[in-house]
Swiss-Prot record:
Pfam family, one: EF_TS
Function: Associates with the EF-Tu.GDP complex and induces the exchange of GDP to GTP. It remains bound to the aminoacyl-tRNA.EF-Tu.GTP complex up to the GTP hydrolysis stage on the ribosome.
Source organism phylogeny: Bacteria, Pseudomonadati, Pseudomonadota, Gammaproteobacteria, Enterobacterales
Keywords: Cytoplasm, Elongation factor, Protein biosynthesis
GO molecular function, one term: translation elongation factor activity
NCBIfam families named among the record's database cross-references: tsf
PANTHER family for the chain: ELONGATION FACTOR TS (PTHR11741), ELONGATION FACTOR TS, MITOCHONDRIAL (PTHR11741:SF0)
HAMAP family the record matches: EF_Ts
Name of encoding gene: tsf
Disulfide bonds, paired cysteine numbers: none
Organism of origin: Photorhabdus laumondii subsp. laumondii (strain DSM 15139 / CIP 105565 / TT01)
This protein's GO CC annotations: cytoplasm
Region (Involved in Mg(2+) ion dislocation from EF-Tu): 82-85
The protein's name in its UniProt record: Elongation factor Ts
CDD domains according to UniProt: UBA_EF-Ts
Cellular localisation: Cytoplasm
Length: 283
């Protein structure tokens, strides 16, 4: 298993739901390329789908707010090491001060923001006893902006046109729950579509269908694929009988962009017990 680490096997298991030995074998055959291993597992039927890379491990809070003029909004992620500190009054107050500065000075660059608060961050680390990090900031500008916070762990910022406050809130809640990656199916990048098309074509061809029929089957699957990962193509969580696109059309509204943050996404946490499990299985 040279070059195939326990962490890599674990990530493949989490993203595909497949067993350990299947994941180990797939990674060996793909020379450690996890994306290639996922594609091969999907083609062979070992994995029906794959979760997006990025395991949630870090603690902290998400802040979401729109400036008083309603035309500038921001999301900020502030990380700490434990859930206990994430609820600490001093930690939360620091986050609110960071957000207030982002809105007042319209800061969109994370390094600029970090530099502005480095002295206060260092002092807070010394006081609380945990590492604290202003991890990221994203902003949107527009005529109609809205936010939604699910607890303090998921935050959404939406820019829309022709929508009222309630509609924007409902759409933001949907985004928090359903995790769309794009606004419209047509926004899905060509390379993402091409990759999925090839996977679906290989699956269809393996069933013994002629290429012409396989292509027709794949066409329908691709419409479903782009719809499922785009906001307007998803079934609305509050009324699954319609899509979010239908909802917006009924209200003569459009969503121009959105940002979704979840605490710790993409930050890896070492788990030594899993390494022991792999070692035991390889004996």
């Amino acid at each position: 298993m040279s070059g195939i680490t326990a962490a890599l096997v674990k990530e493949l298991r989490e993203r595909t739901g497949a067993g350990m030995m299947e994941c180990k074998k797939a990674l060996v055959e793909a020379n450690g390329d996890i994306e290639l291993a996922i594609d091969n597992m999907r083609k062979s039927g070992q994995a029906k789908a794959a979760k997006k890379a990025g395991r949630v491990a870090a603690e902290g809070i998400i802040l979401a707010e729109v400036a008083a003029d309603g035309k500038f909004g921001a999301l900020v992620e502030l990380n700490c090491e434990t859930d206990f500190v994430a609820k600490d009054a001093g930690f939360i107050a620091f986050g609110k001060e960071v957000m207030a500065t982002v809105l007042a000075d319209k800061i969109s660059d994370i390094e600029t923001l970090k530099a502005k608060f480095e002295e206060q961050r260092t002092a807070l680390v010394a006081k609380i006893g945990e590492n604290i990090n202003i991890r990221r900031v994203s902003v949107l500008e527009g005529e109609q902006l809205g936010t939604y916070l699910h607890g303090a762990r998921i935050g959404v910022l939406v820019a829309a046109e022709g929508a009222n406050e309630e509609l924007i809130k409902h759409v933001a809640m949907h985004i928090a729950a359903s995790k769309p990656e794009y606004v419209n199916p047509s926004d899905v990048p060509a390379d993402v579509v091409d990759r999925e098309h090839q996977i679906q074509l290989d699956i269809a061809m393996q069933s013994g269908k002629p290429r012409e029929i396989a292509e027709k089957m794949v066409s329908g699957r691709m419409n479903k694929f782009t719809g499922e990962i785009s906001l307007t193509g998803q079934n609305f969580v509050m009324d699954p009988s319609k899509t979010v696109g239908d909802l917006l059309k009924e209200n003569n509204a459009t969503v121009t962009s959105f940002i979704r943050y979840e605490v710790g996404e993409g930050i890896e946490k070492v788990e030594t017990d899993f390494a022991a499990e792999v070692a035991a299985m390889s004996k």
